[in-house]
C-alpha cells in the first residue's frame, strides 16, 4: 500500500481569497497530474492530507475527483478536535463537506487545541503513517509549510522517504501548460 502525505501553502500564503481564483485551478492541475502519474505507476493507494485552507483542502478535492475513475482513497487528518471552529461560516461549510466526503477522517488528538505539542504529534503521525510526500513549497518563499519541510528533511536522515517538492518555478511552468491545454480544448 502506498500512502502519500500532501501538504503545502495555506490559501492566504498564495494570495487566493476566492474559490474561483485561477491559481487554485493551476494548483489542482499540478496535483492531479502528480497523483495520476503515481496511480498509473502503481505507487498510490491513499492521499492523506490535512484540512488547512489551501493546498491541503485542494488535494482532498482532487483526490475525491480522481476516486471516481481510479481505485484510490482520500483521508483528512487534523491535529485536534474542533479544528475549524474559529473559521468563518463559508470555510467551515467547505471543511464539513470535505470531512463528510472523504474515505477516512480523524483527529490525532481527542481534545480541542491546548498547545503546540498537538501540532508536533500530528506531524509525527503524518510522516510515520505515509510512505512519501508531495509539498507545494518554495524554499525561496518560506511559510507555514517550512515546519513540515524541516521535519521531512530530518526524517530523511534515517529513513527512506521520498519528497516531491513543487516550487513556484514549476507552478509557473505548469500554469503555462494548463493555459495552453485550456486554449486547445476550446477550439
UniProtKB/Swiss-Prot annotation:
Protein origin, superkingdom: Bacteria
Pfam hit, one: YpsA
InterPro entries xrefs: YspA (IPR010697)
NCBIfam families cross-referenced by the UniProt entry: PRK13660.1
Family: Belongs to the UPF0398 family.
Matching PANTHER family: UPF0398 PROTEIN SPR0331, UPF0398 PROTEIN YPSA
Protein name per UniProt: UPF0398 protein LBA1157
